[in-house]
């Protein structure tokens, strides 16, 4: 592609995303399926705006690369070591069992056994990009099924290396003996990357951060991600695996959150580009001429993978309520199939339309996953949101709650217990099915579902409720829910959890004044106790705590329109001096009886 062609392609991608994704969300089919449909529309088999699909698909793999880097940042080496059994146990079993079954089925058609083996391995892989995106949307990241799903995906990335090495052996074009020197050099280069990353990355980022220029830090982050990807690609390894390792090496560094913030916008755009490219690659000509074969293949592929994954989840001890989520989210073919099948085709393993048929099957299977997960959600909703059994004694018998609590993690549970202890009628919405299952056993009235869906809020009693308490883990979900409540249920008093000052600013800008920063109050209370241990009278320490709370809240409101770091730092220094003056003035003016609060503790 020439420069002008790339620019035109970029404009078309952005237009397709802007037009298709909001429409898909409104129709309730999800953003991922919206991207795929947009790709079909602008691709060579749709309106034909873009024809060079392979080049764009290769470039768009960077979305997966950025995603794996961010995931690596969330997993330190010790956490990764804890997952070793699920990675090499469940992950290996899934790949081997799925590949064997699918290869056997392909051999029943006109596939040669060598082509069937390659086809089985390629179809056994799942889409890292789609699975992780859906797991995040469904709140599976911290659940048992989500952790197990990530382990399976990680093993699949590791399996890329031997799978690609197997192709020339099956084609009979491999050398009689391996070039051990070349293999040894690649191993040494990989080990060198690990050692260099372990001891050099943090000092380098410390040096860059000292410059104080945010753009340079972002550029260094992009250089690290793209450099790791290119280095691994040069070694013949998975680019996504390379950036994942780079992320893990920085997971315990002080720059982890800053790195994630710098990368996140690029990750989202490139992931969207990847899904659009996959949609563009769908060969509708092959679909039309082999419609029955393709439909049967997609159904069989998804069914086989669900069966294998469900059985493995059961053997691993995953809760029954989470097994279908785990199996469904990994049931599609993956992006690695495009690479593996292209390599096999260059070695003349496939005949006729075999490669095209397999790629169409993979693409359509990816399109089934968002729809399948919606069906799983509906099934879980019916199972866990139905009438309670006769022997259950729920806290709430009234269908018209006074309060709706969104999210029932540690933060939400404290609020819920306080409200129920005071005989308030509440309904809890939670999208982590394992939490729903556990809480209902203890008699809590907890419903499964995504609270950002207006219909679910309405059925939960939002039209009759007085207040809604939002305790979501993700700030984006909180702000989306605030907007929905203000638009559809303006009578509700909105109370929200803020993870920090940034989220608090966003809530204030949205008109939400009743919020709590999750660590602020507990930190203030511990600070008050510290003042008492240092000899300050309990009453005076309590007054100091109240003064600090009022001043900090005032600062929070004043700094909303300010975005420059220098302005915020200057105002923070001014506030600290003001706080010191308040305490000093109070010490001089107040005369207290120091035995008045002796029993405060």
From Swiss-Prot:
Residues 400-519 form the RCK N-terminal domain. Keywords: Antiport, Cell inner membrane, Cell membrane, Ion transport, Membrane, Potassium, Potassium transport, Transmembrane, Transmembrane helix, Transport. It is a multi-pass membrane protein. GO terms for biological process: proton transmembrane transport. It is found in: Cell inner membrane. Disulfide bonds: none annotated. Its main location: membrane. The chain crosses the membrane at residues 4-24, 29-49, 55-75, 87-107, 115-135, 152-172, 177-197, 207-227, 230-250, 268-288, 291-311, 324-344, 356-376. Pfam families: Na_H_Exchanger (PF00999), TrkA_N (PF02254). It comes from the Bacteria. One of its GO terms (cellular component) is plasma membrane. One of its GO terms (molecular function) is glutathione-regulated potassium exporter activity. Interacts with the regulatory subunit KefG. NCBIfam families: 2a37, PRK03659.1. PANTHER family: K(+) EFFLUX ANTIPORTER 3, CHLOROPLASTIC (PTHR46157:SF4). Belongs to the monovalent cation:proton antiporter 2 (CPA2) transporter (TC 2.A.37) family. KefB subfamily. Pore-forming subunit of a potassium efflux system that confers protection against electrophiles. Catalyzes K(+)/H(+) antiport. HAMAP family: K_H_efflux_KefB. This is Glutathione-regulated potassium-efflux system protein KefB.
